[in-house]
């Protein structure tokens, strides 16, 4: 889902000549492990008003900034749960969330499973 959105954004920003969102999406992907990623901080880095950034971000991605960032984090966490032997708190930290309890709640909100349930389901599918 996120990759498709990135593709759409590339087409949109190239067509309009507006590289701001494309630049921000690249920054988010490259800095996902930082817990300081906020709309306000990203707006400051790019010298734009947070309200303007919020509006244009949603226009381009069809998602608000918070949901987009959470989706990126959850997708990366899912990959880490599938491929690694990291503990939940290590995965949380690697996607920029310092509180493992909050990470578990966020993960469940977006996947309807806890990280442990997701990992168990992946291993169950691999056994078949």
PLM region descriptions:
Residues 59-98, 120-128:
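Terminal helix-turn-helix DNA-binding modules in bacterial transcription factors
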Residues 9, 111, 115, 119-126:
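C-terminal alpha-helix/helix-terminus motif
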Residues 11-21, 36-39, 46, 97:
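Conserved phosphate/pyrophosphate-binding and hydrolysis machinery centered on Walker-type P-loop NTPases
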Residues 2-7, 18, 51-54:
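Short acidic/polar alpha-helix capping motifs at helix-coil junctions
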Residues 20-24, 28, 69-70, 74:
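Generic hydrophobic, amphipathic alpha-helix propensity
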């Amino acid at each position: 889902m996120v990759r498709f959105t990135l593709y759409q954004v590339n087409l949109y920003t190239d067509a309009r000549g507006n590289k701001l969102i494309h630049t921000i999406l690249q920054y988010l992907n490259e800095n996902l492990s930082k817990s300081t990623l906020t709309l306000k901080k990203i707006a400051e880095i790019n010298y734009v008003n947070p309200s303007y950034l919020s509006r244009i971000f949603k226009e381009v991605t069809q998602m608000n900034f918070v949901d987009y960032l959470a989706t990126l984090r959850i997708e990366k966490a899912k990959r880490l749960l599938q491929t690694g032997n990291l503990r939940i708190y290590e995965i949380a930290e690697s996607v920029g969330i310092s509180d493992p309890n909050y990470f578990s709640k966020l993960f469940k909100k977006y996947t309807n499973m806890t990280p442990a349930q997701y990992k168990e389901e992946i291993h169950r599918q691999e056994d078949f």
